[in-house]
Amino acid sequence: MNRLNGKTAVITGGATGIGLAAARRFIEEGAFVFIFGRRQEALAAAVAKLGPSARAVEGSVSSLPDLDRLYAAVKAERGTLDVVFANAGVGSQLALGKITAEHIDETFDTNVKGTIFTVQKALPLMGKGGSIILTGSSAGTTGAPAMSAYSASKAAVRNLARTWAEDLKGTGIRVNVLSPGPTATELAKEALGEEGQKVFASRTPLQRMADPAEIGAVAAFLASSDSSFMTASEVAVDGGLAQL
């Protein structure tokens, strides 16, 4: 399929996990992709895997100057932008009673503030037919021990899409949320640990964690015109975890 032929996409958190899987799928479907992340070594490795239709920009979504550099690079090489996949996120476990201000700041700076400015700074390059995809989480609608800051940040992301769909009326730009469940990424392994991964996998009707490529496939659908009448929607790709 070439559903994204000629399209330009930005994927934050694009060097590993869901972001890398989405970048691979976007390129397979014809897109030119800019991946954005904090670790230069991981970015370089990702570009080596993705090939000539990928570029890497190092930076953090919590840094506005870094985001400015990202979009300056997009404008200089491609001129316009068709797809933004605001995928960068962090998550760690701290139970109520142990939560710190630093924990809240790190979580919300990346997952909420970072998402807001990733999208806002992209808008001048986007036009009719553009697609914005926000990474939510099954944790945004369900409770999980010691994950209150992360869960709250992802619930906020869900409602950003609702509000932005109103703000973007008349522009032809769509905004939707892709909410994965337990996925075998580096972030999940770090946040959940081995036992936590087993617990989450056992809670899904499919009795397993997702492969990042399965999430990337849905991101490609939301990026393409196949989802042209979708905005303000949340697509759960969670093995049924948050649906029962």
Where would I find each of the regions flagged by the language model?
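Substrate-binding pocket helix/loop in short-chain dehydrogenase/reductase
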Residues: 95-96, 100-108, 188, 200
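Active-site helix of classical SDR
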Residues: 119, 153, 161
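Short, small/polar-rich loop/turn modules that mediate ligand/substrate recognition or access, typified
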Residues: 85, 169, 174, 230-232
